[in-house]
Design a protein with these regions (language model features):
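Conserved small/polar residues in nucleotide/adenosyl-binding loops
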Residues: 167-169
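A conserved acidic beta->alpha catalytic loop
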Residues: 22, 37-46, 64-65, 87-93
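Conserved donor NDP-sugar-binding/catalytic core segment of glycosyltransferases
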Residues: 95-127, 131
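Cell-envelope/extracellular polymer assembly enzymes that use nucleotide-activated donors
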Residues: 2-4, 32
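Short, acidic, metal-binding catalytic loop of nucleotide-sugar glycosyltransferases
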Residues: 21-30
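Glycine-rich, basic loop-to-helix element that forms the pyrophosphate-binding segment
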Residues: 62-78, 99, 156-157
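A recurrent flexible, glycine/aromatic-enriched loop bordering the glycosyltransferase active site
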Residues: 118, 141-161
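Short aromatic/hydrophobic "clamp" motif used to bind/position activated sugar donors
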Residues: 83
């Protein structure tokens, strides 16, 4: 299997539904979805059950420990050559996995990512919020009351990494 899509979830069944729906529209089918419910009070298992026949989907419920540990929990159970770590609010455009596959076939990489972008249907306010959450100046620079740019700390989500870099088996 080429890809394992790992999604930590906390009280977001509606978002998970949108993400899973976008995954059903991918041309590339060589992937599994690993949903890790992180102690949610509003679980998404019923949503996941609706996609059981349409996606290779694995649902895990665990006590709340935060998104980082939930990503790791999912990664430990994943089978794909590449781990794609997404948040539950992601909606993948059609052709996303095909585009990644073509690029990895052309030039293999151990890790990859890219900028977030606001969907074309977003309102100006939604686009401004998206920019404020994804711009270099906010995600790795000026935030938390700082007055100048600081070290850039890359995010730990919406990225892909080759599984063999993290696990030997």
């Amino acid at each position: 299997m080429r890809y394992s899509i790992i999604v930590p979830v906390y009280n977001r069944p509606d978002e998970v539904n949108e993400l899973l729906e976008s995954l059903t529209r991918q041309e590339e089918k060589d992937f599994e979805v690993v949903i890790v419910e992180d102690g949610s009070k509003t679980p998404c298992q019923k949503v996941c059950d609706q996609y059981a026949g349409r996606l290779d989907l694995h649902y895990f419920m665990k006590p709340n420990s935060g998104p980082g540990q939930s990503r790791n929990y999912g990664a430990e159970r994943a089978k794909g050559d590449y781990l794609l770590i997404l948040d539950s609010d992601v909606v993948l455009p059609e052709g996303y996995l095909t585009a990644i596959s073509k690029e990895l076939d052309r030039e293999p990489a151990d890790a990859f990512g890219g900028p977030d972008c606001a969907h074309s249907s977003f309102t100006p306010t939604q686009k401004a919020i998206s920019y404020s959450m994804t711009s270099f100046f906010t995600t790795g620079g000026i935030r938390g009351g700082k007055k100048k740019l600081d070290k850039f700390y890359p995010r730990s989500f919406n990225m892909g990494v080759r599984r063999c870099l993290l696990y030997t088996s």
